């Protein structure tokens, strides 16, 4: 059980929500603030004075006054008219994150929503009755309206859900969870729809995947150093301390740890090679820069996870209703775009190391890492696949946030495109997972060819993990299953856990 304290969520909590079947509960300490906010909205609605989002239309229709007897219909119509998403359903971890983030935002007490509505969301979450939310349809400003409308429609008994992974109607989902359809009161529909929770959930889910890919790339990169008989001198701490970037310093330390005790390295320590190619030698500099971007994005997304991104905002102590723009997801868009660049670069550097390993002139290994070249092509076309994926990522890494299209009759005339920025991270991450799988196979092949000299104790664990699924490449064979099985192990974090660098303790 994870207790959600609104405004104080942590990254470890969010990782568990995404990856484990943990249940959640709202911190009782938040109840008083929630109740004060709901009462403030009820008081404003009872007075009948115009207040945006409470008794007016929305967007360009904000100047339209809504009679008191139509306020409940207003909220229902808002939810139904905004449920216009298209595309495949959001993944289960993303929906779980989205619901938890929405509860945290509402739980700060500035949205004016009743506890009964929030309790229903908690009940659905814990019953594993998750709204079916189409992944496309948000521009990331005025909040993630369409995705959150699909979440909210389920509370009304409308739409579809997944009940323990099986698709069903929202009405059936409510029945399984022991709930009845809700009637939303003044502002509650808007409070549910306004917010950056969809884009933030997508970004967080992909952040966690990219963190694991980063750790895996440290392992594959270190293994490639030994496969290519590269030097460990470029990882000397003194070099990196002189530059001062934290990520570079930490990355270099990880490479030193992974390569410590390598007999391969000792065997060529006195060779006449002066410098390695950049893809080996500059790993701390490149991967350090990626690490800094990942950490920065994590910090931005954690702030957003704890934010109140509703509009308007209720301030119960003064009775004020303030319209602002906290729903604009530009911080999320920038964080996701920076993550995209970092993730693409992780894959691009790994592709260069694969190219180095298969080049006999650079690596000193048999051409394409296979004996009897000519009749055997070895890793020749596996590298082509890695190159194709790395090239694709260069297009996917183009920033989504540099684009904007006006919506709502130009009332909402600048938008963030954060949801797309966050969504395309999944495609980049999948490509990187496959590139790293190819590198791990190539590096393992190279290390085998360095026998009788062995790699380091830490990297021997990586070798055992690879060889448990894929044998040494002696002769050409149907290669695709080898890549697929190692890529699956990459996604399962089998190699990430071998890295001395961890994100788990970072908040």
Curated annotation (Swiss-Prot):
It comes from the Bacteria. One of its GO terms (cellular component) is cytoplasm. GO terms for molecular function: histidine ammonia-lyase activity. The gene is hutH. SUPFAM superfamilies: L-aspartase-like. Pfam families: Lyase_aromatic. This is Histidine ammonia-lyase. Belongs to the PAL/histidase family. The modification 2,3-didehydroalanine (Ser) is found at residue 142. The keyword Mitochondrion does not apply. Pathway: Amino-acid degradation; L-histidine degradation into L-glutamate; N-formimidoyl-L-glutamate from L-histidine: step 1/3. It comes from Burkholderia pseudomallei (strain K96243).
